[in-house]
């Protein structure tokens, strides 16, 4: 399943919903799942939940395994969430991803003994749309109920959040496609306001660590500024790091990331289960899409075949020049978390 497994690590695939609890109409048999990176010892560790990005269209493997290993090696027990996405606009997601991450936090706290974690040290780390998902939980946690009675009295509020090149606003600086995936092409004003996170920060929002690059051409850096300003006005502890240069989607910004050694064996589907099930449904004639669309998806995501190269060598050389500055974010975040999670 996952390359780079280390001796003493417990890797499990854990479905977060029972079949009868999960109702997204375009799931095609998929149930959201988390992958664990747990130290095989008796120590109680802080927990980290990773939410990869992908415009709410996919959960990117490049923002999954590598940050999970970074925090695992820093002493965290880590859970990477493959939440519900909307690849082909079959059905707006609405609040399903928010329900997914809320359930994940509650499940981890409920199983704190089993997972060897401290329930008062549960952080979340999201990238791009995954950061929007994490930010949504930070500002709307009180709104999210859970159908499972055992979880209803367990808090879903994270103790701290890392928002990496986050989608934040539905306003002037919005990443529009993320909001189309959530609400369709004709969202209501109420829906857009609810998911414009800078409008909903309160004193109860958990501490947040934000980072982004000035030259991000996909999600404007103003998204981070808007959320940081809202935190400042509400008295929420926060840190903000804006790096001078770098493309969108840098993940941990290492050479390993650049060469796409991202913990996904060639042709495997780690973090791409929903895409594979969609492709299989298309090829079986269970959707309105032409059958060749299924093969197109499998090629695009490298499932069952070699994935096309993401960059040319010349493009990689340009990206490589920006990595040293940006990759410092992981250590900065870990030091910040030690303060706000009171990690020993």
Which residue stretches match the model-derived regions?
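C-terminal catalytic histidine-bearing segment of alpha/beta-hydrolase fold enzymes
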Residues: 91, 225-344
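Primarily recognizes the serine-hydrolase "nucleophile elbow" in alpha/beta-hydrolase
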Residues: 103-178, 188, 192
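Short beta-strand element of the alpha/beta-hydrolase
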Residues: 45-53
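Acidic catalytic loop of the alpha/beta-hydrolase fold
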Residues: 170, 215-219
């Amino acid at each position: 399943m996952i390359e780079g497994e280390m001796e003493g690590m417990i890797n499990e695939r854990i479905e977060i919903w029972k079949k009868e609890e999960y109702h997204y109409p375009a799931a095609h048999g998929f149930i959201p799942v988390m992958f664990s990176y747990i130290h095989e010892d008796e120590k109680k560790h802080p927990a980290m939940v990773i939410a990869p990005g992908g415009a709410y269209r996919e959960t990117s493997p490049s923002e999954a395994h590598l940050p999970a290993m970074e925090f695992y090696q820093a002493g965290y027990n880590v859970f990477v969430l493959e939440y519900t996405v909307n690849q082909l606009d079959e059905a707006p997601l609405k609040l399903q991803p928010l329900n997914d991450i809320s359930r994940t936090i509650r499940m981890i706290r409920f199983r704190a003994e089993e997972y060897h974690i401290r329930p008062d040290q549960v952080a979340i780390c999201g990238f791009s749309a995954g950061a929007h998902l994490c930010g949504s939980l930070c500002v709307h946690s009180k709104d999210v109920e859970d159908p499972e009675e055992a979880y209803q009295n367990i808090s879903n509020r994270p103790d701290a959040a890392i928002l990496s090149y986050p989608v934040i606003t539905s306003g002037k600086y919005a990443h529009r496609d993320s909001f189309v995936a959530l609400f369709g092409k004709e969202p209501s004003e109420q829906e857009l306001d609810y998911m414009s996170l800078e409008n909903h920060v309160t004193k109860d929002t958990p501490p947040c660590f934000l980072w982004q690059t000035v030259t991000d051409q996909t999600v404007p850096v103003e998204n981070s500024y808007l959320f940081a300003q809202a935190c400042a006005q509400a008295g929420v502890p926060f840190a903000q790091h804006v790096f001078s240069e770098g493309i969108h989607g840098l993940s941990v910004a290492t050479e390993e990331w650049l060469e796409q050694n991202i913990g996904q064996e060639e042709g495997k589907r780690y973090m791409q289960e929903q895409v594979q099930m969609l492709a299989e449904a298309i090829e079986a004639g269970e959707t309105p899409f032409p059958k060749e669309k299924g093969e197109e998806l499998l090629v695009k995501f490298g499932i069952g075949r070699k994935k096309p190269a993401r960059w040319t060598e010349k493009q990689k050389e340009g990206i490589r020049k920006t990595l040293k500055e940006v990759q410092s974010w992981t250590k900065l975040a870990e030091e910040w978390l030690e303060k706000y999670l009171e990690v020993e």
